[in-house]
Curated annotation (Swiss-Prot):
This is Mitochondrial morphogenesis protein SLD7. InterPro entries: Sld7, Sld7_C, Sld7_N. Keywords: Cell cycle, Cytoplasm, Cytoskeleton, DNA replication, Nucleus. Pfam families: Sld7_C (PF18596), Sld7_N (PF18636). It is found in: Nucleus; Cytoplasm, Cytoskeleton, Spindle pole. Belongs to the SLD7 family. Disulfide bonds: none annotated. Interacts with SLD3.
Length: 257
């Protein structure tokens, strides 16, 4: 028998403010020791391709939880962001840590057919790999120190530092691009929801979700050139005024009786 484990709320942050995705209920088909439900809080980290995740992320005996939500905003968000079968949403939990490393715990939310599921990232194997790599580096370092000249060691250290700098630069660039795209999505979502409210369109109306999605997709298409430049790292953020004008034009068109 399925049992509700907890309720998850997570934040999408941006320069224009924060949007909270609320009331995501996690249910399990497996028996658990705890009988009380709790509330988890989290922060959106990024979108991932599930097919490209390392094998250690998900163990074979890991629990997969079913996700439900009565929130129209949450339903619209997941419908928009999980259209691709292999896409996942990474959430860092604010009040839960990995028991072994005491590092933040992470959930990945994904869609399987028509069902919304999630699982917690398993860091156990990663820590084992990290430990083995650290030990191997120490052993190699001792061997090289005994047979190498001081100058060659300096070169190795310098090359290692240069590789680290190059990796960090690439990561910072990707994070900057993701931040711009996330800011666009957050601002667009808020403008659409606000425009629907101003027009007295309640989320209880049958075509509410369809109208939201059609407006969202049309706005993305309208600004496709700017979004393409952003994805290449050469574009500026789409201005709030430009996006607001697009949404108003689309809503006038789609809600015209």
């Amino acid at each position: 028998m399925s049992r509700k484990l907890c309720t998850l709320n997570f934040t999408l942050s941006g320069k224009q403010g924060s949007l909270v995705i609320r009331d995501i209920q996690l249910w399990s088909n497996r028996p658990t020791a705890s009988k009380s439900t709790s509330e988890l809080r989290g922060q959106f980290i990024q979108y991932v391709d599930l097919a490209k995740l390392p094998l250690w992320v998900r163990s074979t005996n890991m629990n997969t939880y079913r996700c439900y939500s009565t929130s129209a905003t949450a339903q619209a968000y997941f419908k928009s962001k999980l259209r691709n079968a292999n896409r996942g949403i990474v959430i860092e939990l604010s009040d839960k840590v990995d028991q072994r490393s005491q590092e933040p715990a992470y959930l990945i939310i994904f869609r399987e057919n028509t069902e919304l599921n999630c699982f917690q990232v398993d860091l156990t194997m990663k820590h084992e790999f990290d430990g083995q790599v650290t030990k191997l580096k120490q052993e190699i370092g001792k061997t090289r120190a005994s047979v190498s000249k001081e100058g060659s060691i300096d070169i190795i250290i310098q090359q290692s530092q240069q590789r680290k700098i190059g990796t960090k630069t690439k990561v910072y660039r990707n994070v900057h691009i993701n931040d711009k795209r996330l800011q666009f999505n957050e601002t667009l979502s808020k403008l659409i929801l606000g425009g629907l409210r101003l027009r007295g369109i309640s989320n209880s109306i049958t075509d509410y979700q369809k109208l939201y999605k059609v407006t969202f997709d049309a706005a993305e298409f309208t600004h496709r050139d700017e979004l393409k430049r952003i994805s290449m790292g050469s574009g500026e953020e789409v201005s709030f005024e430009s996006l607001q004008e697009t949404v108003e034009t689309l809503l006038k068109l789609f809600t015209k009786s």
